[in-house]
Amino acid sequence: MPDHAPSPLQTRLAKEITGDVLFDRFSLGRYATDASFYQIMPAGVVVPRNMDEALRALAIARDDGRIVTARGGGTSQCGQTVNNGIVIDFSKHLNRILSLDVENRTCVVEPGIVLDDLNRQLKKHGLWFPVDVSTASRATIGGMAGNNSCGGRSLRYGTMR
């Protein structure tokens, strides 16, 4: 049984997004925290199946006047992944390497790919991504870019800029 009657925002998102559209208290509670001490209940969560759905969710949230936060692994220690608007979680479906150019040492990835997973795939080609956050088994590239993450190798290899 639903926690409450669906809002117009929830109804529209559910109609236009095939990925998960979460407005129940349990799901919202899971997204109300990250690795920080902040706890902010979001209005809703969207887990898009592809980038078109992510863009659609963003447009719907904008039409409704909601703030939006992109979320990956939720490993932020400063509360960047929590808000009282709409959270778009990229970690479930948008987590692949889209292209890899070994010769030029470049790749294009989706925002939800986990750093350790990326490096496992790059290692097969003698490559690696040198930003070494302590949460590499859970941190996503999108979240790392949003935070300008760095690590012990940042003096030599730089940050996410």
Q: Model-predicted segments: where are they?
A:
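Short glycine-biased active-site loop of nucleotidyltransferases that positions the nucleotide triphosphate
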Residues: 35-36, 77-82
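Beta-rich nucleic-acid/ligand-interaction surfaces
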Residues: 138-142
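Active-site beta-loop-alpha junctions enriched in small/polar residues
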Residues: 26, 134-136
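Conserved PLP cofactor-binding pocket of PLP-dependent enzymes
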Residues: 71
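N-terminal glycine-rich flavin-associated loop
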Residues: 13, 36-68, 86, 90-133, ...
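N-terminal accessory segments
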Residues: 1-35, 41, 60-68
